[in-house]
Swiss-Prot record:
This is Protein YdeP. It comes from Shigella flexneri. It comes from the Bacteria. Its cofactor is [4Fe-4S] cluster; Mo-bis(molybdopterin guanine dinucleotide). The keyword 4Fe-4S applies. Binds 1 [4Fe-4S] cluster.
Length: 759
């Protein structure tokens, strides 16, 4: 693997994407049999992409797949297997020396496994033995709240519903979830602002908008199929403006791989009409600057007898809190706005002008907005900006959070939450005849804190790589090994499986692409995309191993063993997933006619009250919510000279690392790098390719023991006073205490650091 730093000149997509897909297929898949499955991905009669949550268009191309979706499916249907012979040759201690890419690249898990401390190896056992032993451990605990039930966003609606049902009959609301680490500020912030913790737009709204503002996200890597929608709106004359600390190729220009003309002529579409490199941690200052300019110009227009720039009728009829917001933003000083945002008043005025001129605006955002200590307030400032011009609840306008994993939103909809509503619990109890627990449980940060203090004794993970995704992983590694029980439901080996508890199990399951055969025949599961569309997913490939079970079957097996007197007919439900969906419909009325509607091509849309200007808030209206000050990360209040954000590489999805390249950013064969601007490199007196150390700072500006050594400097077009490193390698630079108090999300996107040359 050749290591190099070399500027990539191509557009997003194009022949670079085709070559990358070919390499992924060649390394992982049986080309004769498995590649054909890609033609069934994101199709009504096929399976949903196991990658991102971008919605499927109604009339999609015959090959509706993106580069990273292809990598995800190649990763899943690999011919390589991790079985008993693999573990006979590799102890857990030896595997801990492997890289995270190497661990998952070893292949698919195909047998139930139990850790044997004497040999330091995982050894196979039968499914029934695994269920019985896990059930016995769960029965032994005096308090059900000693168990943490983690969920990954790859889990289907059906499996997630059964999982929460099992945990609540067991007696716990402990539901740490991957969404706690990515879009929890969306769920909390939007619910407080507009009454619904989800986005308000549909894919069709991108066909009607005048302007799309993309802030704090990177579609070229994290949701590449979005580029097709951005290309289409630009082609018809609408504008897209990008706001991001780094210049990301997927926001700049795009060559559509499905377009023969563009591929043959090497032509491309310019996406962003303007690009603003906001400083890391400067989003709130920028947004308040925009709102201040809009209000001042609206005041001037009113004084001169000109039409209002704001939607006064909408504000008066549908909102509360505008006067308080007005006072707050008008009191924000320009010198502070410019210093914190890294943008001049002139640049912010350009943004305000573009927004004022547009009749219909969509704001799209990702974890660059949410992963801050005030991530919830960041989301609410985006809503404030939209409410000022009535851009919620009309065609071609709205808020568009870009969720990560393909069903992370659906899992929450069907009950994966540590704070369930009283109505949900009442309907669940009525359906099944048991009293669910009402006390709030643990989200991700609280669950890890419970593990670290010894309060938690067991961890069950429905997918994911919990240990690697969390902050402060060095501090949490030892407590994880001191648990009594760890159960990992998974398709691939990862580092979390190697932090073994007293009793550790790995339970292998079917992938999204594989046929799920139950007593009534082949089953479909359902997922919910970022825009609240529910659709079916049907596997088409032969399972990777004869012993694999579905997620639903695994949950039912554990539940039956742990709850021998259960009131739930677990086997009956798993025999036919229509029965699970009937129960979901009974508990959640918005799923009316569930089984009938998922059989329609494309599925159905869950009603979003805010999109219809029905405000399910205590005030009965949309709320302008003021956030005091301009800092979205109070731990940086001492005005650290350098702030670091963690990001994915292009060969990565969440904690899964498909390869060692980051093509669009020009990094190949390596991940031990730190990105900075040329101006910042000059200030720090370092050059491209030199090695440096980063030391995390405490909230009072002092050096901590958390550090990253010998990172290679990559000079890159981006904001100054900002550094970028890769997630999850840099997660340990953040403590468990560095999180948003409203949503609990870790502040991965704004870690104050100090830089020094490496010896």
């Amino acid at each position: 693997m050749k290591k190099k730093i070399e500027s990539y000149q191509g557009a997003a997509g194009g022949w670079g994407a085709v070559k990358s897909v070919a390499n992924a297929v060649r390394k992982q898949m049986d080309i004769r049999h498995d590649v054909i499955a890609m033609f069934d991905m994101n199709k009504p009669e096929g399976f949903d992409c196991p990658g991102c949550a971008w919605p499927d268009p109604k009339n999609s191309a015959s090959f509706d797949i993106c580069e990273n979706g292809a990598k995800a499916i190649a990763w899943e249907v690999t011919d390589k297997q991790v079985n008993a012979s693999f573990f006979a040759e590799n102890t857990v201690q030896s595997l801990l020396t492997w890289g995270d890419h190497e661990l998952e690249a070893a292949g698919r898990l195909t047998q139930p496994l139990k850790y044997d401390a004497v040999s330091d190896c995982y050894k196979p056992l039968s499914w029934q033995q695994a269920f019985d032993e896990i059930g016995a451990r769960l029965q032994s605990y005096s308090d059900p709240n000693q168990v943490e039930f983690y969920t990954s966003g790859r889990t289907s609606n059906e499996a997630a519903f059964l999982y929460q049902l099992f945990a609540r009959e067991y007696g716990s609301n402990n539901f740490p979830d991957c969404s706690n680490m990515c879009h929890e500020p969306t769920s909390v912030g939007l619910a407080a602002s507009i009454g619904v913790g989800k986005g308000t737009v549909l894919l069709e709204d991108f066909e009607k908008c005048d302007l799309v503002i993309c802030i704090g996200h990177n579609p070229g890597t994290n949701h590449p199929r979005m580029l097709t929608s951005l290309r289409a709106l630009v082609k018809r004359g609408a504008k897209m403006i990008a706001i991001n600390p780094l210049q990301e190729r997927g926001l700049e220009r795009f060559t559509a791989p499905q377009n023969p003309f563009e591929m043959l002529t090497n032509s491309e579409t310019q996406l962003a009409s303007a690009y603003y490199n906001v400083r890391i941690g400067g989003d709130m200052a920028l947004l308040k600057g925009m709102m201040r300019l809009l209000i001042e110009r609206d005041d001037a227009a009113s004084a001169a007898g000109r039409p209002s720039l704001l939607d006064d009728e909408f504000i008066q009829t549908h909102t509360v809190g505008f006067d308080e917001l007005r006072r707050d933003v008008l009191n924000s000083e320009w010198k502070d706005i410019e210093r914190i945002s890294g943008l001049s008043q002139t640049q912010i005025a350009e943004l305000a002008d573009a927004y004022a001129a547009a009749e219909r605006t969509i704001i799209c955002y990702g974890m660059g907005i949410t992963q801050h200590e005030h991530g919830t307030q960041n989301v609410q400032q985006l809503v404030n900006l939209l409410l000022m011009k009535g851009n919620i609840g009309k065609p071609g306008a709205g808020i568009c959070p870009l969720r990560g994993h393909s069903n992370v939103q659906g899992d929450r909809t069907v009950g994966i939450t540590e704070k369930p509503s009283a109505e949900f619990l009442a309907r669940l109890g009525e359906r099944y005849g048991f009293p669910p627990p009402h006390a709030p449980g643990h989200a991700a940060i609280a669950s890890m804190q419970a593990i670290c203090t010894g309060q938690a004794r067991a961890l069950i993970c429905m997918g994911g790589n919990f240990a690697l995704a969390m902050p402060d992983r060095e501090a949490s590694a030892v407590p994880l090994t001191q648990l009594d029980l760890a159960v990992h439901v998974a398709t691939k080996l990862n580092r979390s499986h190697l932090l073994t508890a007293r009793h550790s199990y790995i339970l292998p399951v079917l992938g999204r692409s594989e046929i799920d055969m139950q007593k009534s025949g082949a089953q479909a599961v359902t997922v919910e995309d970022s825009m609240s569309m529910i659709h079916a997913s049907r596997g088409v490939l032969k399972p990777a191993g004869v012993m694999l079970k579905s997620e639903c079957a695994v949950v039912a097996g554990i539940a039956q063993a742990a709850l021998p007197q259960s009131v739930v007919a677990w086997e009956y439900l798993v025999e036919d997933y229509d029965r699970i969906r009937n129960d979901i419909e009974a508990v959640l009325p918005e799923f009316a006619d569930y089984n009938q509607r998922i059989r329609h091509p494309g599925g159905f849309h869950l009603i979003n009250a805010a999109a219809e200007r029905r405000w399910m808030t205590p005030s009965g209206k949309a709320n302008f919510i003021t956030s005091k000050g301009l800092l979205e990360d109070p731990s940086s209040a001492f005005n650290s000279k350098l702030v670091m954000a963690t990001v994915r590489s292009h060969d990565q999805y969440n904690t899964t690392i498909y390869g060692m390249d980051d093509r669009y950013r020009g990094v190949f064969g390596q991940r031990d790098v730190v990105f900075m601007s040329a101006k910042q490199a000059k200030i720090c007196r370092v050059k491209n390719g030199e090695r440096v150390n980063l030391i995390a700072l405490t909230p009072d500006g002092k050096r901590s023991s958390r550090r990253m050594d010998r990172l290679k400097v990559v000079i890159y077009p981006m904001a100054d006073r900002s550094l970028v490193t890769y997630f999850p390698e840099s997660n340990h630079m953040l403590t468990l205490d560095n999180h948003d108090p409203l949503s609990g999300i870790p502040g991965y996107k704004s870690i104050p650091v100090e830089l020094e040359p490496s010896n």
